[in-house]
């Protein structure tokens, strides 16, 4: 059975659309993985504990929040900035609110600017390490514990950093079957 040129073209176009759809679905997790592995685009380090050394020099850390188009949550930092000593542990909070009538899951991608600070900005604990699930009308405060590594002062570019911006963008993710079943059960219980 031979395909006509029109059928081959239509089949090729369907394949292109399917590949593009699959690539867009996988883009956020792949980008997060790529940035963590390479340190690209100011991706931060992950640490288990703060350094023993705390310097007298301070750095101002600013906090930024945004949402991917279509993400229905409200999302914001609870403080705009803080100043801390290099090596000192900082604790900041972000707030997320789900104003919809459905359960919504999301993950946060993150980066630090300037890029020279990315490898020296370390998170000990962060809401961005796991998926967040908010029920309808739920509001949560989400912490991030971090520090700026004292090694930054030995870096030819990093030593001039006086201000760092930590940015998060929340992306909606599909609910797992278990989460969707719990959400449906909760909605049924209300009615």
From Swiss-Prot:
Record's subcellular location: Cell inner membrane
Topology feature Cytoplasmic, residues: 1-9
Keyword Transferase applies: no
GO molecular function annotation: copper ion binding
This protein's GO CC annotations: plasma membrane
Membrane topology annotation: Single-pass type II membrane protein
GO terms under biological process: respiratory chain complex IV assembly
Membrane-spanning residues: 10-30
Record topological domains on the Periplasmic side: 31-191
Keyword Zinc-finger attributed: no
Taxonomy, superkingdom: Bacteria
Alphabetic keyword roster: Cell inner membrane, Cell membrane, Copper, Membrane, Signal-anchor, Transmembrane, Transmembrane helix
Similarity-based family: Belongs to the COX11/CtaG family.
Role, per record: Exerts its effect at some terminal stage of cytochrome c oxidase synthesis, probably by being involved in the insertion of the copper B into subunit I.
PANTHER family assigned to the protein according to its UniProt record, in alphabetical order: CYTOCHROME C OXIDASE ASSEMBLY PROTEIN COX11, MITOCHONDRIAL-RELATED, CYTOCHROME C OXIDASE ASSEMBLY PROTEIN COX11-RELATED
UniProt protein name: Cytochrome c oxidase assembly protein CtaG
């Amino acid at each position: 059975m031979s395909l006509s040129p029109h059928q081959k073209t239509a089949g090729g176009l369907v394949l292109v659309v399917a590949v593009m759809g699959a690539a867009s679905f996988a883009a956020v997790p792949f980008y997060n993985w790529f940035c963590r592995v390479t340190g690209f685009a100011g991706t931060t380090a992950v640490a288990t504990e703060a350094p023993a050394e705390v310097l007298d020099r301070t750095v101002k850390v600013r906090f930024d929040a945004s949402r991917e188009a279509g993400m229905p949550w409200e999302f914001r930092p609870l403080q705009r900035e803080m100043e801390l000593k290099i090596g000192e542990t900082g604790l900041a909070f972000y707030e997320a609110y789900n104003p919809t009538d459905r359960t919504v899951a999301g993950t946060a991608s993150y980066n630090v600017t300037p890029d020279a600070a990315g490898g020296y900005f370390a998170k000990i604990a962060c809401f961005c390490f796991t998926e967040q699930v908010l029920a309808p009308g739920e509001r949560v405060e989400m912490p991030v514990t971090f520090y700026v590594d004292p090694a930054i002062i030995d870096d030819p570019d990093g030593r001039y950093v006086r201000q760092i911006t930590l940015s998060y963008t929340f992306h909606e993710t599909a609910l797992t079957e278990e989460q969707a079943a719990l959400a449906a059960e909760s909605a049924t219980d209300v009615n």
